[in-house]
Amino acid sequence: MATTRYEPVAEIGVGAYGTVYKARDPHSGHFVALKSVRVPNGGAAGGGLPVSTVREVALLRRLEAFEHPNVVRLMDVCATSRTDRDIKVTLVFEHIDQDLRTYLDKAPPPGLPVETIKDLMRQFLSGLDFLHANCIVHRDLKPENILVTSNGTVKLADFGLARIYSYQMALTPVVVTLWYRAPEVLLQSTYATPVDMWSVGCIFAEMFRRKPLFCGNSEADQLGKIFDLIGLPPEDDWPREVSLPRGAFSPRGPRPVQSVVPEMEESGAQLLLEMLTFNPLKRISAFRALQHSYLHKEESDPE
C-alpha cells in the first residue's frame, strides 16, 4: 500500500473534500498533505478506477509537468483500499503550513501593505490564468484553499478535484460557504471560468477589509447582499430559466466600492468592479486582470 511510505503527523482539517492529513516522507524528510477520496468502483475486470477519475487524475498529472510556481504540487496518487462499491484513492500534495485566511489573520493592524496585496494578487491571478488556459474551472476559490508559503509565494490548492470528489460529496453532504460564489452559481445557471473571477474579486476586497465582503446565509440572501453593492442588474443580463426571478429582488442602484473598501484607491476599485460584474460574459478574465494598470503601478505614498 503506497501510503504506508508516508508517516502521519497530524490531522490538518476537514473540508468539502474530506479529511486532510499532514504526513512525512521518510525518504526525503519533506512534509506532504494527504487527501483521500472514495470513488465508485469502475466495474471493470478487477474493479479498477472509473474512467472519469483516471481522466481527472491524468489532467492533474499533465499540469504537474509545467511546474507552475503558483499551483500546489501533486507528488503522488495511490489507490489504497477497495470494497465492492468503491475504491479509496489518496492524493499526495506538497504541504504548505498556512492558507490566506491564516496569513491575513496574522497581519498586524491595519492589515497588509498595499504593495503586498498587489504581489499576492499577481501571483493568485497567474496561477488561475494557468488553470483556465488548461480548461480547469476551480469552482470553490476561497481564502482556505489559497496557500501562502513562508517566503510569500501563493499556491492554489483543491483545483481539478470537483469531479473526482462528486461521488464522495454525494455520500457525505457538507455545508459549503456561499460567500465567494458567483451569481450564476447562486442562481443555478450554467457557468464556466468567469465563476472563479467573481471569487477572486471577493478575496481581493477581503485582503483590504480583513473580513468577507458578502456574508449571506442562503442563496437569495447572498444575492441580496451582492445587489446592495453592485445594484440590481438589468433584465437583459438576468439569465433565463434560473432558480430565482429578477422580480424577487427590490430595485436598487450601485454603491461606490469605497463604501465597503475605503482603503482601495480608484484604480483598484475599478479592477474590483470588473471582477464583480454580474454578467459572466462581461466579467474580466484572469489574463486581462493580470495586465491591469493597478497591479503594475507603485502605490502613491501619502507620507
From Swiss-Prot:
Q: What binding partners and quaternary form does the record give?
A: Component of the D-CDK4 complex, composed of CDK4 and some D-type G1 cyclin (CCND1, CCND2 or CCND3). Interacts directly in the complex with CCND1, CCND2 or CCND3. Interacts with SEI1 and ZNF655. Forms a ternary complex, cyclin D-CDK4-CDKN1B, involved in modulating CDK4 enzymatic activity. Interacts directly with CDKN1B (phosphorylated on 'Tyr-88' and 'Tyr-89'); the interaction allows assembly of the cyclin D-CDK4 complex, Thr-172 phosphorylation, nuclear translocation and enhances the cyclin D-CDK4 complex activity.
- Carrying Phosphothreonine, the residues are 172
Signal sequence range? none
Give UniProt keywords alphabetically: Acetylation, ATP-binding, Cell cycle, Cell division, Cytoplasm, Kinase, Membrane, Nucleotide-binding, Nucleus, Phosphoprotein, Proto-oncogene, Serine/threonine-protein kinase, Transferase
Q: Which PANTHER family match?
A: CELL DIVISION PROTEIN KINASE, CYCLIN-DEPENDENT KINASE 4
Look up and give the organism this protein is from. Answer: Rattus norvegicus
**What family does this chain come from, according to its entry?**
Belongs to the protein kinase superfamily. CMGC Ser/Thr protein kinase family. CDC2/CDKX subfamily.
Gene symbol here is: Cdk4
User: Any idea of its EC number?
Assistant: 2.7.11.22
Q: Where in the cell is it found?
A: Cytoplasm; Nucleus; Nucleus membrane
The main location class comes to cytoplasm
**Mechanisms controlling activity:** Both phosphorylation at Thr-172 and binding of a D-type cyclin are necessary for enzymatic activity. Full activation of the cyclin-D-CDK4 complex appears to require other factors such as recruitment of the substrate via a substrate recruitment motif, and/or formation of the CDKN1B ternary complex. Inhibited by INK4 family members. In resting cells, the non-tyrosine-phosphorylated form of CDKN1B prevents phosphorylation at Thr-172 and inactivation, while, in proliferating cells, tyrosine phosphorylation of CDKN1B allows phosphorylation of Thr-172 of CDK4 and subsequent activation.
| Entry function | Ser/Thr-kinase component of cyclin D-CDK4 (DC) complexes that phosphorylate and inhibit members of the retinoblastoma (RB) protein family including RB1 and regulate the cell-cycle during G(1)/S transition. Phosphorylation of RB1 allows dissociation of the transcription factor E2F from the RB/E2F complexes and the subsequent transcription of E2F target genes which are responsible for the progression through the G(1) phase. Hypophosphorylates RB1 in early G(1) phase. Cyclin D-CDK4 complexes are major integrators of various mitogenenic and antimitogenic signals.
Question: Domain of life of the organism in this record?
Answer: Eukaryota
GO CC annotation terms, alphabetical:
bicellular tight junction; chromatin; cyclin D1-CDK4 complex; cyclin D2-CDK4 complex; cyclin D3-CDK4 complex; cyclin-dependent protein kinase holoenzyme complex; cytoplasm; cytosol
Query: Is the keyword tRNA-binding assigned to this protein?
Result: no
Q: What class of enzyme is it?
A: transferase
Which one of the record's GO molecular function terms can you name? kinase activity
Which Pfam family would be a valid example here? Pkinase
One BP term from GO: response to toxic substance
Q: Does the keyword ATP-binding apply?
A: yes
Q: Where is this region: Required for binding D-type cyclins?
A: 50-56
What is the protein name stated in its UniProt record?
Cyclin-dependent kinase 4
Q: Where is the active site?
A: 140
- Domain (Protein kinase): give its ranges: 6-295
Residues reported to bind ATP: 12-20, 35
The N-acetylalanine modification is found at 2
